[in-house]
């Protein structure tokens, strides 16, 4: 059964529809650095996952926090938007969800940027503990974020594990990103559920798949791209040069081109 929930989203541009899904604790505005480049050739729908960003604080009663539930909720959103088989793309957890949606036949293509779901047990523990530490720090710093991120050094210290070049984030983007992480009500439950799960059945994917990994990803290590290649026969593997886990801030041109190439018929 597909559960429906109203998600916050932005829709702009013209062309084939491309749905953008952010990662855990993130928000739809994380795609802003690549948006102008994309919407010249695609109708772009950037959404907030349930319980994150501006989407409803509480998902429907009885909804679990796992990847399967999030996939079902986003699938319901696609129905509400009249998007039968759009191109799909996502970062981190959003990349994993894009692949799951594509397995269900909900997409014409899937592009995953440093997707979650391809870690071994040790790597998954490292990522979980890292993110738990990140969110605790974010909750402590959130009341002072406006003043704090006027300093480039503060941006480096706060986002260095997620972005290869944190000073390319503006103070306003840094503040908003930290607040989105600190205030996300479904973060802890979603993180624990995702850490215990893995991507499976990649051979069921019958649409074009691109896996792009930041070569300087310090959260989900770049070597996981090799595991993704083994699990998804025929996937196009791209290494994003000089990019971290959230590559949109590091090199918008490079990332936009990967998204455009991955969403061509």
Predicted regions and their residues:
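Conserved HGGG/HGGXW glycine-rich cap/lid loop of the alpha/beta-hydrolase fold
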Residues: 10-57
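Conserved acidic catalytic loop of the alpha/beta-hydrolase fold
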Residues: 68-86
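Gly/Ala-rich beta-loop-alpha elbow adjacent to hydrolase catalytic centers
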Residues: 90, 94, 98
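Flexible "cap/lid" loop of the alpha/beta hydrolase fold
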Residues: 107-142
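Conserved alpha/beta-hydrolase catalytic His-Asp/Glu region
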Residues: 146-203
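Conserved serine/cysteine hydrolase catalytic core
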Residues: 183-230
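Catalytic histidine neighborhood in serine/cysteine hydrolases
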Residues: 230-245
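Catalytic histidine-centered segment of alpha/beta-hydrolase-like enzymes
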Residues: 243-256
